Amino acid sequence: MANTINTNEEFENILKDNKFLVVMFWADWSKPSTQMRDVFDQLAKQATNQANNKLLFLKVEAEKVHQISGRYNVKSVPTCIFLNQGKLVQSVVGANPSELALQTNNFSKTCDTLPLEEQQQQQQSEEIINKIKLDQEQEKKLLNERLEKLVNQSPVMLFMKGNPEKPQCGFSNKTVTILKENGFEFGSFDILQDQAVRNGLKEYSNWPTYPQLYINGKLVGGYDIIKDLNEEGELIDLKP
């Protein structure tokens, strides 16, 4: 398991005695952080089991120990950094387990590990990377299947912030108003309640913002497009 750092003083003391550090910055409100912490602990355990291991894995709650976050210009979580004598040599930003495993393997090669140890560690890292990739592919497949069902849940589906009775953003509120004024019956999904859907739907439909309107499973667009269609009298023609 990786060591948890609670104060800047703890970090400074460790920095004096350890040349090679892998540090993960996380936050308890960040779901991607939870996923990456599990991978980070797995990589730390693997390194600990290696003879002549010189890597030390540390976990830092970014907002709690902000001195360290600021020192290495950490602006989002999860972020993992690789330090050689306190100097930043590499970083992995976001929930990217395969990239973290790859960079950890590459970083370990700079730590004077014996050739046999390198081979064993590389093999184990590759196995971890392959497993992570398979898990990611399966997870993405399941998410896309879920998204396809959601966009077809109703002939007209609005993915929005909040719900039609209580929209949580101005654009969602305006979109609901336009649909109601045109007599649309529609289902809705509150993307604030599901981070996986919120992030996944952007990639699924290649549309970066919300709200998103779907008719018969096909993306119509966001508020600007809905507004233009309404003003041109074309929105009503899309009603199923």
Curated annotation (Swiss-Prot):
Give a GO biological-process term.
intracellular iron ion homeostasis
Free-text comment about domains: The thioredoxin domain lacks the two redox-active cysteines. This strongly suggests that it lacks thioredoxin activity.
Query: What domain of life does the native source organism fall in?
Result: Eukaryota
Name listed for the protein in its UniProt record? Glutaredoxin-3 homolog
Residue span(s) of domain Glutaredoxin: 144-240
CDD domains, per the entry: GRX_PICOT_like, TRX_PICOT
**SUPFAM superfamilies for this protein:** Thioredoxin-like
Question: What keywords are annotated for this sequence in UniProt?
Answer: Cytoplasm, Iron, Iron-sulfur, Metal-binding
Annotated Gene Ontology cellular component terms:
cytosol; nucleus
